[in-house]
Amino acid sequence: MQLTNFTDFGLRALIYLGSLPEGELTSITVVTETFDVSRNHMVKIINKLGQEGYVKTIRGKNGGICLGKPADQIIIGDVIRAIEPLQVVNCAPEFCHITPACRLKGALAKAKQAFLDELDKHTIQDMLTDNSELLILLKRI
């Protein structure tokens, strides 16, 4: 299953925010530059993650962004469910005339569930714990 760029960069942003010392704020600009993505795209991603409670945004002169909850409470499968469309194929009868007899939809649904079940075992903290190489890369970029 391939994730959209929106979800890919959303997960990267959460990992980056999780790598910061607790309570430290950063800016969308810093996250944008870290991952070489357009600012407009990252603003949309951060807004969605904020709506879902994964990112806290603080406005004003001393404002910025940080994780909205502890990294060990942000389950990757939940993040994907919240921001990814997750429609593997379009099985509406008006788009596919074999839908009434097709078994592919069921197989794909099981595969999608297995994908999410695996990601439900991992948190943002899991991506950071004992991963000094990642932390070095995030600081160096």
From Swiss-Prot:
Pfam families: Rrf2. SUPFAM superfamilies: Winged helix' DNA-binding domain (SSF46785). GO terms for cellular component: cytosol; protein-DNA complex. Residues 28-51 bind DNA. [2Fe-2S] cluster binds at C91, C96, C102. Residues 2-129 form the HTH rrf2-type domain. One of its GO terms (molecular function) is transcription cis-regulatory region binding. Keywords: 2Fe-2S, DNA-binding, Iron, Iron-sulfur, Metal-binding, Repressor, Transcription, Transcription regulation. Coiled coil: none annotated. The keyword Repressor applies. InterPro entries: TR_Rrf2-type_CS (IPR030489), Tscrpt_reg_Rrf2 (IPR000944), Tscrpt_rep_HTH_NsrR (IPR023761), WH-like_DNA-bd_sf (IPR036388), WH_DNA-bd_sf (IPR036390). Binds 1 [2Fe-2S] cluster per subunit. Its cofactor is [2Fe-2S] cluster. Nitric oxide-sensitive repressor of genes involved in protecting the cell against nitrosative stress. May require iron for activity. NCBIfam families: PRK11014.1, rrf2_super. This is HTH-type transcriptional repressor NsrR. It comes from Aliivibrio fischeri (strain ATCC 700601 / ES114).
